């Protein structure tokens, strides 16, 4: 017999999980499925930072507070910032944003995506929502007024509303033939965490260079404010050269590109290089179907705003 739900959310990432929690208490039978085990690892506050982070806005914080998730985030690790410094590498312009200018304590928080995800999963496991872990979607078609989904293990799911929250390479978007508008940015993003000789002053820094933007996003670990998450967007050829450098060579290149604003770059965690591609679904909704988060829109990581848009 087919499993049935009122709302079937495919993808338990940050946006899909947040939607599931938001629907709790609505009277709707909600089923959330994901290809991962949906397990939560014990958090080690002394552990290295995850390479992927988001700059959560005050609006996103309020959403996560209403969902009962925010405390679980700050108990793990969240780094507030109250200033932003942005400048042009050619010296022609700069801009400064301050939380004080809008009568706020902070502009936002830099948080590892894994931290947000685990805090959401903690709440999900405490709720009466239906969770299907390690469930891979294979087929999807209309069946009367419902969508009929077939999983890789042969199980069948049925729902009048399916929400695609399964990321940039959405299987739901592909299986439903939802068209997209997309193009390559012709840039790659190098992401890692680095330690500097000077504290970051709870400031988000961004320099626009001739080959692309370089961001230093403040991180706090064990009370130390000398760590930053960096996102360095540059050409494929330049990113290949930078990825080939040893740690010391990369730190020197990074220090020069950042004009030494935080002194010496002392160390860098292992780097990840991600090709950048814009992808935008031409429609977000269809009969019994909605696309959210990266399944609907993938943007440049310039300001770490993807999760904010999704929420």
Predicted regions mapped to residue ranges:
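Conserved N-terminal helical subregion
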Residues: 2-3, 76-175, 183-188
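N-terminal Rossmann-like FAD-binding beta1-loop-alpha1 element of flavoenzymes
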Residues: 5-32
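Conserved Rossmann-like nucleotide-cofactor binding loop
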Residues: 15, 38, 169
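Conserved mid-domain beta->alpha element of the FAD-binding
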Residues: 20, 274-311
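Rossmann-fold NAD(P)-dependent oxidoreductase module
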Residues: 22, 119, 123, 193
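Glycine-rich FAD pyrophosphate-binding loop
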Residues: 24-51
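N-terminal FAD cofactor-binding segment of flavoenzymes
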Residues: 48-89
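Conserved FAD-binding catalytic core of PHBH/FMO-like flavoproteins
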Residues: 162-271, 276
């Amino acid at each position: 017999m087919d499993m049935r739900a009122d709302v079937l959310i495919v993808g338990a990432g940050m946006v899909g999980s947040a939607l599931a929690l938001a629907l709790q208490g609505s009277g709707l039978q909600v089923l959330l499925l994901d290809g991962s085990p949906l397990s939560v690892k014990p958090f080690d506050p002394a552990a290295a930072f995850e390479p992927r982070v988001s700059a959560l806005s005050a609006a996103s914080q309020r959403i996560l507070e209403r969902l009962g998730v925010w405390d679980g985030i700050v108990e793990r690790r969240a780094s507030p910032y109250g200033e932003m410094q942005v400048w042009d590498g050619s010296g022609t312009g700069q801009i400064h944003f301050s939380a004080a200018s809008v009568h706020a304590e902070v502009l936002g928080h830099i948080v590892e995506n894994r931290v947000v995800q685990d805090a959401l999963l903690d709440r999900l496991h405490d709720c009466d929502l239906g969770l299907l872990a390690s469930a891979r979607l294979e087929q999807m078609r209309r069946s009367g007024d419902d969508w009929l989904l077939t999983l890789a293990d042969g199980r069948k799911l049925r729902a009048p509303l399916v929400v695609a929250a399964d990321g940039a390479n959405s299987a739901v978007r592909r299986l439903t033939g939802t068209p997209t508008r997309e193009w390559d940015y012709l840039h790659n993003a190098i992401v890692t965490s680095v330690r500097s000789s000077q504290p970051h002053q709870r400031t988000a820094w961004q320099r626009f260079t001739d080959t692309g933007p370089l961001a230093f996003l403040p991180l706090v670990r064990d009370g130390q404010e000398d760590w930053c998450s960096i996102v360095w967007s540059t050409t494929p050829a330049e990113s290949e050269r930078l990825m080939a450098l040893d740690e010391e060579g990369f730190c020197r290149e990074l220090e020069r590109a950042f004009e030494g604003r935080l002194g010496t770059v002392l160390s860098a965690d292992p780097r990840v290089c991600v090709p950048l591609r814009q992808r935008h679904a031409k429609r977000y909704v269809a009969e019994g179907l909605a696309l959210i988060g990266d399944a609907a829109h993938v943007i440049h990581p310039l300001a770490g705003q993807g999760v904010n848009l999704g929420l």
